[in-house]
Amino acid sequence: MNELLSKVNRLIRRTAQRLAACEASLQKLNAEKEKLAEKERLYDMQLKNLKSLLDKKELLGEVVFRQDIFYSLRKVAVIQQQIAEINLEKQKIAERRKILNKEIVQQQAQRKHWWLKGEKYVRLKTRIKKTFKSDASSRRA
């Protein structure tokens, strides 16, 4: 009977280790997700600033020299290029977030699996102990 209890205890420890590993993995994934969200907020701020700068570069009925027009066009092209690069980075972040969400769902399923196994082994251990106690008391009687 003690041998059976020791095997069940070993199973309980193993499931607790796997559960802890799942928790650690989930924390790591959530931390990475937070970093991505922070990056995206920074990119949004940069986009907002670049778009406002782009709006300021519009020539609204002003009399300007030809060189000023070319200068403004170069500035606008640079700003538009920066906006395109930021949008590309935001797309990469969105793709990574999708992957992270899938990994998080998988880890949550694994965590649930190991938690249920652990609970099953704990219930088994209590049943074994009850059986052991009832067998011991019936032998005494």
Give the residues covered by each predicted segment.
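Charge-rich amphipathic alpha-helical interaction elements
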Residues: 1-141
